[in-house]
Amino acid sequence: MFKLKVFTDGGSKGNPGPASIGGVFYIDNKKIFQFNQSIGIATNNDAEYQALIYALEEIKKQKEKLANDFKVEKIEFYSDSRLLVNQVKGFFKVKNGKIKEYILKIHSLEQEINLPISYHQIPREKNKEADRLVNI
């Protein structure tokens, strides 16, 4: 049984301003995939959520390969955004309508992926690779 560890990050210059997302996927401490993408004008929070959604959509696309080739049975997400992690886990109330839409999309993707998924907040220093991809 292998865990897929996914580190995501998002940021904007200006908040709102030009924004980017990034993420890195690891299995057994080996990098298997990474992404970075400009997302136009957005807030930092929007970028954090869009990074997570992008990662979930990529996992959904690669679900068969992850299950068959890599024997992934569990997914762990890591983010330095305390707000994102606690809102996705249901610990913090979501007031913003756009964030509510992101949460619904995340939960829908979780159901489609149909594997155990957990979310963890980490210090910014432990998210350097995803942060680097945001700032390319």
Question: What is the predicted function of each stretch?
Answer:
Residues E48, L52:
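Short, conserved alpha-helix that lines the donor NDP-sugar binding/gating region
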Residues M1, L133-I136:
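Alpha-helix C-terminal capping segments
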Residues M1-D46, E57-E58:
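RNase H-like nuclease fold core
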Residues G11, N15, I53-V134:
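RNase H catalytic domain
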